[in-house]
């Protein structure tokens, strides 16, 4: 199969040796041989100096001639016609070069910068002796397209509507319908737009360079076939002279992979009807609000078995996923990256189309419908966003104009050894602006409620995952990536200024200080941070046989030492159920009963621990196998009442978490947590209070061994003289698949001092279970 690059190369004129057999054509007035050769061989960097309307000086005292030159390789005939279709001039071919030229009548309107003064009628061979006629305005009759302010903001890295400035804009220019193409490629020798409308021939539509900014532009009228739905790319002659064919960095629509072309997006905006949600989402995402996130890989959440296991599109996902997630009581859906990415096995974490939802699941408007349906169901939408690195696919950003434009030239700064990807040059204004504009595209134009920024740790440290001789210190000799810090601070500041109520979340796996501190206090400015330390410590604890847990008691307690140093989300994410790590259930020790009991206890511990919640799909019903992005979760397990019990527990945990302020209002404040028993290593028992803003407590007791414990005394605070505490949740309940050992729904308060409190309760602790009590 011939690629776009092969086709574009194949359409070049004959080699010089073959062309030398034909006599050189006579040159039209005002054109020299070198310029003609550069045009016909695709090397012309300034096409507007040759093509379109021009004034030619004549003998002294005579009126200057007005001529038109048009380049249409393969055309039989080209005419300049007036708006009524009358022939103004027959353009003569310049040999077999594809260039046509002719003189406009002296009384014709001035065509320079006024495309309506004439049109071009091009006659093409159509096979079997037939002809095809194409009529359109001349792309080279249009004046400058982008305004000075646009170019200034692009150069400064502050054009937040970049996808409405660069790229492909279906629009009217000088009252002519068509598509305005623009791309930043400051070091290219020549840039052309190629696509369905010009047979992917890079000689046909070379673009104009706006000097000083590195932006190339061209308006292609609709009469030439350019419009919404047209496939296109940019063909460049790089700084090194090599031919490159690149997808549009700011394309708002793409072909479905493995195809790699960009697609002209529909200019009509989506008609949103989620104003009520947008006005209230700030309150739904504050630190004192309940946030329970269901993490989803859109391509594998559910497969269409009747259609060969095909992934669902956005509309089908909206019908199935949204009611499922809302029915379980989650507050948010978090989508693994949906920006266009060439390799499905990257799960979206190696994107190249940072402004376009992946065409795997439908057009951009289908994604907008999905988001709106989430909002109608009172679900927030968080999208994973990847500004840390990008893949080196030849159609992408790598050496975009023949130089290291988006990345660092030095591989010690620009190459990520773990992922074989390239690292953005955060010190370059245009690159920072490109990335921030991408973030705003998702938040402003797709109404996304939050961005989870991937791999922040890899951005913050110049020596991240590198040996000592493979990194470059910063200007102070340190390991901190100061340019990345400045970028993250600027990104967060701009997002919060332009998108009220939207949140940003950092996946940051180190102890970098102030990730969620305000930028004005030298923090990074994120709203939340994934608590990777809590996740690793607690999972390691739960993986141990209960008989050994007494020796690793701090696996569950240590997280409280730093639980309020940042605003945390507790993540049981996709990263913990892949690459041989097994599923959450698979990590639990013991026989089938013990594994399920361990999982239930762990989920309840997480839901009652300070911090917002995140759970990856499949974890909510105890999937047996680890996640496979080519297959759906093991939904058949819900035929087993034990797995339905885990799912029921997640539903009830969400309901309790959302309804009880003590469990969420102070998730990020130390006043919302107090240990009662944190040192009972021998029994692996933990007891703690969660408190709302009024100080009203809930008591959580966890027994992390399979040994039931009767008569376990726990000190409790005096709450308005209450004489009993109610059992609000017990993970050993029969409805969850447990043994149904508990306290009959209530425990009495006794005037017996314990654990520093004047009063106490005696609780029956079921095996491998968590009990939640409330006055």
From Swiss-Prot:
Its EC number is 2.4.1.18. One of its GO terms (cellular component) is cytosol. This is 1,4-alpha-glucan branching enzyme GlgB. The active site is at residues 454, 507. HAMAP family: GlgB (MF_00685). It is an enzyme of class 2 (transferase). Residues 8-24 have a biased composition (Low complexity). Keywords: Carbohydrate metabolism, Glycogen biosynthesis, Glycogen metabolism, Glycosyltransferase, Plasmid, Transferase. Belongs to the glycosyl hydrolase 13 family. GlgB subfamily. GO terms for biological process: glycogen biosynthetic process. Catalyzes the formation of the alpha-1,6-glucosidic linkages in glycogen by scission of a 1,4-alpha-linked oligosaccharide from growing alpha-1,4-glucan chains and the subsequent attachment of the oligosaccharide to the alpha-1,6 position. It comes from Ralstonia nicotianae (strain ATCC BAA-1114 / GMI1000). Residues 1-39 are annotated as: Disordered. NCBIfam families: branching_enzym, PRK05402.1, PRK12313.1. It catalyses: Transfers a segment of a (1->4)-alpha-D-glucan chain to a primary hydroxy group in a similar glucan chain. It holds the Pfam family CBM_48. Pathway: Glycan biosynthesis; glycogen biosynthesis. The gene is glgB. One of its GO terms (molecular function) is hydrolase activity, hydrolyzing O-glycosyl compounds. Monomer.
């Amino acid at each position: 199969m011939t690629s776009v690059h092969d086709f574009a190369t194949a359409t070049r004129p004959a080699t010089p040796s073959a062309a030398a057999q034909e006599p050189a054509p006579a040159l039209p007035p005002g054109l020299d041989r070198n310029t003609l050769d550069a045009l016909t061989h695709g090397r012309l960097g300034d096409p507007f100096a040759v093509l379109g309307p021009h004034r030619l000086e004549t003998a002294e005292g005579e009126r200057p001639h007005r001529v038109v030159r048009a380049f249409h390789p393969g055309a039989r005939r080209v005419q300049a016609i007036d708006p009524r279709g009358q022939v103004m001039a027959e353009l003569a071919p310049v040999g077999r070069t594809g260039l046509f030229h002719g003189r406009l009548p002296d009384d014709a309107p001035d065509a320079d910068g006024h495309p309506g003064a004439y049109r071009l009628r091009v006659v093409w061979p159509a096979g079997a002796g037939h002809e095809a006629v194409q009529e359109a305005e001349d792309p080279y009759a249009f004046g400058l397209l982008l305004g000075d302010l646009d170019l200034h903001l692009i150069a400064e890295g502050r054009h937040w509507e970049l996808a409405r400035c660069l790229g492909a804009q279906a629009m009217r220019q000088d009252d002519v319908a068509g598509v305005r193409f623009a791309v930043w490629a400051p070091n290219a020798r020549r840039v052309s737009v190629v696509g369905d409308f010009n047979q992917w021939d890079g000689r046909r539509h070379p673009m104009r360079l706006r000097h000083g900014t590195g932006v190339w532009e061209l308006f292609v009228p609709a009469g030439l076939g350019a419009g919404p739905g047209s496939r296109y790319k940019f063909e460049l002659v790089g700084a090194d002279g090599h031919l490159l064919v690149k997808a549009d960095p700011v394309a708002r629509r793409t072909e479905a992979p493995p195809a790699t072309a960009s697609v002209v997006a529909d200019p009509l905006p989506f008609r949103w009807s989620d104003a009520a949600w947008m006005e209230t989402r700030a309150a739904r995402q504050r630190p004192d609000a309940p946030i329970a996130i269901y993490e989803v890989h859109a391509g594998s959440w559910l497969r269409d078995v009747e259609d060969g296991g095909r992934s669902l599109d956005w509309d089908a996902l909206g019908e199935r996923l949204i009611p499922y997630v809302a029915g379980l009581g989650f507050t948010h859906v978090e989508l693994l990256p949906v920006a266009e990415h060439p390799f499905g096995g990257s799960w979206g974490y190696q994107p190249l189309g940072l402004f376009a939802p992946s065409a795997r699941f439908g057009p951009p408007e289908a994604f907008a419908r999905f988001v709106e349906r989430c909002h109608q169901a009172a679900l927030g939408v968080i999208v994973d966003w990847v500004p840390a690195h990008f893949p080196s696919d030849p159609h992408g950003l790598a050496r975009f104009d023949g130089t290291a434009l988006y990345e660092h030239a030095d591989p010690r700064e620009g190459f990520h050894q773990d992922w074989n990807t390239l690292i953005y040059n955060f010190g370059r204004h245009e690159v920072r602006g490109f990335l921030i504009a991408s973030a705003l595209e998702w938040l402003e134009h797709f109404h996304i409620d939050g961005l989870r920024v991937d791999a922040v740790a890899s951005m913050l440290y110049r020596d991240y995952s590198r040996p000592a001789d493979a990194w470059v210190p910063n200007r102070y000799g340190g390991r901190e990536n100061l340019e990345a810090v400045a970028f993250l601070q600027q990104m967060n500041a701009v997002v919060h200024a332009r998108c009220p109520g939207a949140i940003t979340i950092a996946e940051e796996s180190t102890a970098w200080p102030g990730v969620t501190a305000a930028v004005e206090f030298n923090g990074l400015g994120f709203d939340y941070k994934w608590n990777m330390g809590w996740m690793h410590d607690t999972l390691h604890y739960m993986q141990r046989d209960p008989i050994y847990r007494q020796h690793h008691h701090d696996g569950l307690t240590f997280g409280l030492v730093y639980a309020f140093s940042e605003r945390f989300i507790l993540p049981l994410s996709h990263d913990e159920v892949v690459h041989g790590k097994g599923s959450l259930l698979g990590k639990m020790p013991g026989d089938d009963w013990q594994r399920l009991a361990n999982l239930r206890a762990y989920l309840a511990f997480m839901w009652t621990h300070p911090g917002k919640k995140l759970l990856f799909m499949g974890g909510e019903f105890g999937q047996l196998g680890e996640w496979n992005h080519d297959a759906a979760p093991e939904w058949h397990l819900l035929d087993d009442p034990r797995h339905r019990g885990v799912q029921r527990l997640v539903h009830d945990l969400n309901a309790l978490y959302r309804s009880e302020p003590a469990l969420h209002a102070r998730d990020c404040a130390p006043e919302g947590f107090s240990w009662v028993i944190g040192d009972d290593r021998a029994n692996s028992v933990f007891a703690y209070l969660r408190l709302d803003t009024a100080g009203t407590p809930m008591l959580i007791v966890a027994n992390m061994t399979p040994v039931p414990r009767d008569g376990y005394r726990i000190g409790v605070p005096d709450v308005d003289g209450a004489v009993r505490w109610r059992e609000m949740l017990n993970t050993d309940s029969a409805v969850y698949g447990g043994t149904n050992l508990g306290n009959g729904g209530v425990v009495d308060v006794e005037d017996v001092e314990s654990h520093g409190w004047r009063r106490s309760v005696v609780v029956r602790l079921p095996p491998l279970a968590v009990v939640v009590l409330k006055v």
